């Protein structure tokens, strides 16, 4: 069974689609997508469940969420294995994701109390009480790169606030979405509070268009997010929160400190998860001169030694394949385009079996106008520069604004960087990936519009209600002109 609607597992009535393991192209999941009619049924079930769910005391909603967290802990190895098979990420990495699925629930609970509680103040003789109320039915769109952890960062805050959910996983990771839904079922979630619909583009469009949806929490590519944004232009009554990608700059100062530590930080920033994290470094700014030359030489040498293999291989690999053969081709095509524009490959990314692509580094200093695209994979562009102010100017030349970083031991350089860079997440002397659930996650421009993840998701799962409360109705000393009593 593919879909969970109104507390029942049902078969999809749309077109068949499959999940292919990206490291060997074996079919590991098969099902039929949800039709528009089935999506409407899921939304109706969520709407019906919302009536009672929002009335439940917070303690009851919290208890069910905590029961789910326990189920995740009990099944953490199974979750890690499923994610590894669907995404191709090394098992050591997917184990950290399984742990985060349960671990960040505590952040969401704390956020509910911190950001959606009641507050009272006096003003002009009135008592002003700020309360928070759930929006209603939330559509949650999950990405393929973190198919367990990231959707959870939307679903849990939505439920805690009293909303109900229709969840659509990525069509490339349906097995993970199905497994998570089964754990919610085992945790005792009432019927209709979460509904799972699977499918590709048609299912997603139907969900975004559904009249019973009050808000969308989306994590995914900029292209898909912008389609949703245009789709919402005629639906002002819906809340839309987008978390999208970035063309993230990483600036290396002449004062970068330890060479090996700097190279390791770059590799972790650019090639972790085979470059398939939205915060990965895409552009590396390296100063002209001997220190910059030494850095690039060491980086190229270390990158050649990166172990790439299947997720369960021994010894353990650092990175696996791209999510699909099409995604692998996209990276190779991007590299070819940069080469045609004048880029010089320091290491050429090469296709392997199935969806594997080896990491590539390309010097694009001589390209006058770099394509402002998110190359979601292991392709790092190097730009040589002179002067930190020039590096920051080049780094800001993008429509995105998610993540940025500076490697420097100089405090004044850091102050200049953090004051002038345009990014929502800024890092000093650490990898660009691996943001904290306690911090806002997102950025300006094409990287998104809100910060609906983990701690700050509470802001978008409930609306503030301000009530001005007087002790009794009072007649003013002076009536408004034209009124006689």
Swiss-Prot record:
HAMAP family: Aldedh_AstD (MF_01174). The gene is astD. It comes from Vibrio parahaemolyticus serotype O3:K6 (strain RIMD 2210633). The active site is at 243, 278. NAD(+) binds at residues 220-225. Its EC number is 1.2.1.71. Coiled coil: none annotated. Pathway: Amino-acid degradation; L-arginine degradation via AST pathway; L-glutamate and succinate from L-arginine: step 4/5. This is N-succinylglutamate 5-semialdehyde dehydrogenase. NCBIfam families: arg_catab_astD (TIGR03240), PRK09457.1 (NF006992). One of its GO terms (biological process) is arginine catabolic process to succinate. It comes from the Bacteria. It catalyses: N-succinyl-L-glutamate 5-semialdehyde + NAD(+) + H2O = N-succinyl-L-glutamate + NADH + 2 H(+). The lineage of its organism: Bacteria, Pseudomonadati, Pseudomonadota, Gammaproteobacteria, Vibrionales. The keyword Chloroplast does not apply. GO terms for molecular function: succinylglutamate-semialdehyde dehydrogenase activity. Belongs to the aldehyde dehydrogenase family. AstD subfamily. The keyword 4Fe-4S does not apply. PANTHER family: ALDEHYDE DEHYDROGENASE-RELATED. Catalyzes the NAD-dependent reduction of succinylglutamate semialdehyde into succinylglutamate. Keywords: Arginine metabolism, NAD, Oxidoreductase.
